[in-house]
């Protein structure tokens, strides 16, 4: 199973490196999301820059980048910890995409896909918390910063073997939002 783990981890990183925001912006003639709007290659910035249709396609593509490798790992009999680490590889691909000079997004939708494949109730909790926080604050980054760590107690209770990789995933997302944290504290963060 070790060789299958490494094969799937590599596949997850390479799949995660496909940036749907960048690809769709190029295909549609929209601005590069890394250089426009919030500067993030993700669905929220695509909504600002290119509209709902491309934002939804970006969201679905990014979600599948996390979901597919985790589901494959489960189908091949890898344990929840290994599935979690494979999911982390998919998110690392999104954050640091090989194909786009290692300049990617913040990993929230890809992480949601990982959770969906690993433990769907945790994904449902994260999505509900994200939507509620976005509705109340109109701030996508704050929604991500609240929703992502909120899943950890549920995972500790129901999928304890996946807790370490999912904690690493949470730290990666919080780290990737460090600029947003500064802007939130200074009152400069973008709202919808």
From Swiss-Prot:
GO terms for biological process: phospholipid biosynthetic process. Pathway: Lipid metabolism; phospholipid metabolism. It is found in: Cell inner membrane. It is a multi-pass membrane protein. The chain crosses the membrane at residues 4-24, 54-74, 80-100, 112-132, 154-174. The keyword Oxidoreductase does not apply. It catalyses: an acyl phosphate + sn-glycerol 3-phosphate = a 1-acyl-sn-glycero-3-phosphate + phosphate. GO terms for molecular function: acyl-phosphate glycerol-3-phosphate acyltransferase activity. Its EC number is 2.3.1.275. It holds the Pfam family G3P_acyltransf. One of its GO terms (cellular component) is plasma membrane. The keyword DNA-binding does not apply. InterPro entries: G3P_acylTferase_PlsY. Keywords: Cell inner membrane, Cell membrane, Lipid biosynthesis, Lipid metabolism, Membrane, Phospholipid biosynthesis, Phospholipid metabolism, Transferase, Transmembrane, Transmembrane helix. Probably interacts with PlsX. Catalyzes the transfer of an acyl group from acyl-phosphate (acyl-PO(4)) to glycerol-3-phosphate (G3P) to form lysophosphatidic acid (LPA). This enzyme utilizes acyl-phosphate as fatty acyl donor, but not acyl-CoA or acyl-ACP. NCBIfam families: glycerol-3-phosphate 1-O-acyltransferase PlsY. Belongs to the PlsY family. This is Glycerol-3-phosphate acyltransferase. The lineage of its organism: Bacteria, Pseudomonadati, Pseudomonadota, Gammaproteobacteria, Pseudomonadales.
């Amino acid at each position: 199973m070790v060789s299958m783990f490494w094969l799937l981890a590599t596949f997850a990183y390479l799949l995660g490196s496909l940036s749907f925001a960048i690809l769709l912006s190029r295909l549609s003639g929209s601005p590069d999301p890394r250089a426009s709007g919030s500067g993030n290659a993700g669905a929220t910035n695509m909504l600002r820059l290119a509209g709902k249709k491309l934002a939804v396609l970006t969201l679905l593509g990014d979600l599948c980048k996390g979901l597919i490798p985790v589901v494959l790992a489960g189908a091949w009999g890898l344990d929840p910890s290994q599935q979690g680490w494979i999911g982390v590889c998919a998110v690392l691909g999104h954050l640091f995409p090989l194909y786009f000079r290692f300049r990617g997004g913040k990993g929230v939708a890809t992480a949601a896909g990982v959770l969906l494949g690993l433990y769907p109730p945790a994904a449902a909790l994260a999505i509900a918390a994200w939507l509620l926080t976005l509705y109340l604050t109109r701030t996508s980054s704050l929604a991500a910063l609240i929703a992502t760590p909120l899943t950890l107690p549920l995972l500790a209770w129901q999928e304890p073997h996946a807790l370490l990789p999912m904690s690493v995933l949470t730290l990666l997302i919080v780290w990737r939002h460090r600029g947003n944290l500064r802007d939130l504290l200074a009152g400069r963060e973008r709202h919808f």
